[in-house]
Amino acid sequence: MTIVKISDVGKGLNADLTPEELQMGVWSDARNMRFANGYAQRFNGLAPIFAAPVVEPYYITAFQKPNKRLWIHAGTERVFSDDESVRTEITRLAEITISTLTHVTTTATLKTSAAHGLTTGNSVTIYGAYPLQYNGTFTITVTAPDTFTFTMASDPGADASALGHLTGPSAATANFTGTRDDRWTGGVLAGIQVLNNGVDVPQYWTGDANKLRTLPGWNAGWTAASLRPWKNYLIALDITKSGVRNPHMIKWSVAAVPGSLPDSWDETDVTRDAGELPVSDTADLLVDALPMGDVLIIYKERSMYALRFIGAPYIFQLQRIPGDSGMLFRGCAVSTPLGH
């Protein structure tokens, strides 16, 4: 038998091809070994990073804080964070719908769309309102079954243009309503985790003691099949508004201030840079998006587009990529040094 010298044996493992089809240096099987940087190395084994999850996870991602790393995992109904020693449920809380939010100097009057069930002395939390003085945790004085007042730290100077969201002192957990087929999407923008399951309103989490919360400026009657952070924006695809699906619509937020999420998605506000764009020159539906260098690749079922930031007044430019390839389902592409 002729002895053949193989100088490079660290090209990796390929279990899909038969041994006869492999090039020199590629292995058909390996146990307790890994390949990195052209070398074959002994593998030290695996160790669990946290105990068995409470729910069957259909989404998992690492969330980096300055002092530690958290693992966020989501089932169909509940979401948890785990720092490898303590597991915390961060599923959203039930909210009370705000109908009006007005002020006289530093005294705010909040009216709910139905009886709120609160009493004087209760502590409530408001977030996502604008001006920002309306946000925070306040002790209230009830003046009617659907109305209460509270004192702000300073005068907001105007009634609330964005009503925000209200949670009471004993708000119950509000489970999500997706199924296994409603794949979670999201990412990190400005150090804040965003999550979206396509059937409930998108959520965010800041990595603190708060639970998941509704995105600022997002209309309660909207959903998005996919939500991805890109540059200083959040990009949403396949938008449903008040029950009407727009499967060819791309929608983007205003640019985020560093350290904060975008506060508006209002495409009709000509003073801001939020907007919408149809991708309707092909019949296939929008699926997902993934950055590639300085562009965002928008995937439909059988076509691809490049979204580029060009600034005011159009903000983004959309260009068709030649070919008839697309994406099978959300999350079915990854970034590599050679592309997707």
Give the ranges of each region predicted by the language model:
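Small/polar beta-strand repeat architecture
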Residues: 92-181, 211
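Recognizes the extracellular SEMA beta-propeller fold with strongest preference
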Residues: 1-95, 167-340
